[in-house]
Amino acid sequence: MSEPFEIVAGALGVAGLFNNCVACFEYVQLGRHFGRDYERCQLRLDIAKVRLSRWGEAVQINDDPRFHSSAPIDKSVQLAKSIVEEILLLFESAQKTSKRYELVADQQDLVVFEDKDMKPIGRALHRRLKDLVSRRQKQTSLAKKTAWALYDGKSLEKIVDQVAGFVDELEKAFPIEAVCHKLAENEIEEVEDEASLTILKDAAGGIDAAMSDAAAQKIDAIVGRNSAKDIRTEKRARVQLGNVVTAAALHGEIRISDQTTNSVETVVGKGESKVLIGNEYGGKGFWDN
């Protein structure tokens, strides 16, 4: 029988607890009830993990001796240890809730998604984020766990929201804001297409401002400029100012990395006319009836 969490955790320093905390994300699977939201939810879980690992990288948690004592003297390190323990307990509680659900649920409700179920762009982002965290990680010390599943969106959002809140506290305890923003920029340095950046920006919303901002800035640099000095419409005419990235582009193989400039002086739309000042990527979108 494994030792109680309190005993094992008490023998570890913050660095050891932290690495085990980040590793907890690896054991979480998502149930089929997530449906079409699966990909976005998986990426939100990935981004919460990346943000937590980013804090560890920013404070050099695996190299700074302050984080290796099981009884730290530094007040900020004591606080960090308390917060990391809370995150571990959060996962422990969520796992227990899932286990109770499994006792009463039908077998068909316990089927989980796999990486292969993601669309190409989402799967590539998932793997990229996973590899990024792996490069930052040290070997864990707590007992290896078996995979377990979250079966509803509320449980997942509770985890990512609370992890984000805990990381907020960790970032406040250490003056590393500039470092974290730079690391976030580096994390998406090799992501060059608008569709991938748009997905990242959306998935990071509300849980990782640094990544969301970095993705938004990179999108602005990629898409170029679309402008019109004067736009007038009558009746049911429609004008779209800016690029259109359809669902087909977001979830397909399309890579959008061109920088364009589309500029007009005056647009007058009448009747049923439709005007796009920008580019459209993917199948049906703005022009659909």
UniProtKB/Swiss-Prot annotation:
Responsible for heterokaryon incompatibility, a process that ensures that during spontaneous, vegetative cell fusion only compatible cells from the same colony survive (non-self-recognition). Interaction with the prion form [het-s] of incompatible cells triggers a lethal reaction that prevents the formation of viable heterokaryons. The globular domain exerts a prion-inhibitory effect (in cis) on its own C-terminal prion domain. The het-S globular domain, but not the het-s globular domain, is essential for programmed cell death. Residues 1-227 are annotated as: Globular domain. This is Heterokaryon incompatibility protein S. GO terms for cellular component: cytoplasm. It holds the Pfam family HET-s_218-289. One of its GO terms (biological process) is apoptotic process. GO terms for molecular function: identical protein binding. In P.anserina, the het-s locus exists as 2 incompatible alleles, het-s and het-S. Strains of het-s genotype (e.g. A, C, s, and V) can display 2 distinct phenoypes, the neutral (prion-free) [Het-s*], which is compatible with het-S strains (e.g. D, S, U, and X), and the reactive [Het-s] phenotype, which causes rapid cell death in het-S strains. Although the two alleles het-s and het-S differ from each other by 14 amino acids, vegetative incompatibility between s and S strains can be attributed to a single amino acid difference in the proteins encoded by the het-s locus. Keywords: Apoptosis, Cytoplasm. Residues 218-289 are annotated as: Prion domain (PrD). Its main location: cytoplasm. InterPro entries: HeLo_dom, HeLo_sf, Het-s_prion_dom. It comes from the Eukaryota. It is found in: Cytoplasm. The gene is het-S. Homodimer. Forms heterodimers with het-s.
